[in-house]
């Protein structure tokens, strides 16, 4: 069982049962990845910019959530929300250029090209102290 609680009051906010359906979850995530990979780069950039805008619009609510759930000081929580929004915005603005294929000048070779393709879902154990930053980066 996963429990979230407010460290300032000791009250339990939410409880989540553990799941035995790891294969089902990974299947769903893989479907999402397949859809995302097929999405045009310009559309992906637009989505990232929309996420940045949503973080800006809901900054107080997002900051309050991590203040309540993990005891992060309000100023630090606001700073993390702003940082995450800036990361989404940066990738929305610069990401398409980063994904452009590169041609390398290699002596004796006809063509050397570097392409950037998504490889698949990532499962990770993340530190708890920067939840929005961990996802944005």
Q: Over which residues does each language-model region extend?
A:
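Short, structured beta/alpha segment
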Residues: 1-68, 90, 97
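N-terminal Rossmann NAD(P)-binding subdomain characteristic of aldehyde/semialdehyde dehydrogenases
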Residues: 49-136
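Conserved active-site and cofactor/substrate-binding residues in soluble primary-metabolism enzymes
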Residues: 20, 24, 117, 137
